[in-house]
């Protein structure tokens, strides 16, 4: 199939909510980037595909881990053994998905990107998938995943701060996810709040320069930054258990 046909099939798979197949079609497209960089549309389709595939497993993992904690609290050892085994199966799927996109980013997408916007997009994506690994890995593997996340986000941030406007949806999405990393993986609420607040304040001060095409995307991410700040600042004073927001919607909202 041609590049155009693979893109069309990826859109069809998205409509049918068959995200594993959407990933397959977009991987074929991504492997042609030696010739030509992915378009914004193609880049977003790839991101949406992977985000849905990983998102389902991340949700499953959280539910199963929560049940495991409850069963441990009840002293239900037989159930705990079964749950651990099942959780291991989900973790194997998570690892495979993350490894797939990280290989693709390293072999094709990051090296072929020339524009600042696409470099930040792919490096942010690299950070995101290392972060997803850090969510469930333990010991040395978790440390390695966290370090790789930091390196990717930092590289993306350096380019974003130099070349993208504070209101740019990709720069904002990066700040959002980087701050989530500080909060959830590194357990650094102060750093998380500072990063999110700075990104929000800088964007607010330049809101009047925002073009119509990215206004919706940028303001949506700014709202998520503010939601997290509210949650985190209340968490610093009390132990809250609400859900942290990250750049989701398949990350497509950041790439317009």
Curated annotation (Swiss-Prot):
GO biological process, one term: protein localization
Record flagged with keyword Cytoplasm: yes
Origin species: Oryza sativa subsp. japonica
Keyword Cytoplasm: yes
Compartments, as annotated in UniProt: Cytoplasm; Nucleus
SMART domains, sorted: 14_3_3
Domain of life of the source: Eukaryota
Subunit annotation: May form a complex with the transcriptional activator VP1 and the bZIP transcription factor EMBP1.
Expression induction or repression: By wounding, drought and salt stresses, benzothiadiazole (BTH), ethephon, methyl jasmonate (MeJa), hydrogen peroxide, abscisic acid (ABA) and incompatible and compatible races of rice blast fungus (M.grisea) and rice bacterial blight (X.oryzae).
Tissue expression profile of the protein: Expressed in seedlings, internodes and panicles.
Lineage: Eukaryota, Viridiplantae, Streptophyta, Embryophyta, Tracheophyta
Identification of the protein by name: 14-3-3-like protein GF14-C
PROSITE patterns according to UniProt: 1433_1, 1433_2
Gene behind the chain: GF14C
Family that this chain belongs to: Belongs to the 14-3-3 family.
């Amino acid at each position: 199939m041609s590049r155009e046909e693979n893109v069309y099939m990826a859109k069809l798979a998205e409509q049918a909510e068959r995200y594993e197949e959407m990933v397959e079609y977009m991987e074929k497209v991504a492997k042609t980037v030696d010739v030509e960089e992915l378009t914004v549309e193609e880049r977003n389709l790839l991101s949406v595909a992977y985000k849905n595939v990983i998102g389902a497993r991340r949700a499953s993992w959280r539910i199963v881990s929560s049940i495991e904690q409850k069963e441990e609290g009840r002293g239900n050892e037989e159930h705990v053994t079964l749950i651990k085994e099942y959780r291991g199966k989900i973790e194997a799927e998570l690892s495979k998905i993350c490894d797939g996109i990280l290989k693709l980013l390293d072999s094709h997408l990051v090296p072929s990107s020339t524009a600042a916007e696409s470099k930040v997009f792919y490096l942010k994506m690299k950070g995101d998938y290392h972060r997803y690994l850090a969510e469930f890995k333990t010991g040395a593997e978790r440390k390695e995943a966290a370090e790789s996340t930091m390196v990717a986000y930092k590289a993306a941030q350096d380019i974003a701060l130099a070349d993208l406007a504070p209101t740019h949806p990709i720069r904002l999405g990066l700040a959002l996810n980087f701050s989530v990393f500080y909060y959830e993986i590194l357990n650094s609420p102060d750093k998380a709040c500072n990063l999110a607040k700075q990104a929000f304040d800088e964007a607010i001060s330049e809101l009047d320069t925002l073009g119509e095409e990215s206004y919706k995307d940028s303001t949506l991410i700014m709202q998520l930054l503010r939601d997290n700040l509210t949650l985190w600042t209340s968490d610093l004073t009390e132990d809250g258990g609400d859900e942290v927001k990250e750049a989701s919607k398949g990350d497509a909202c950041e790439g317009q």
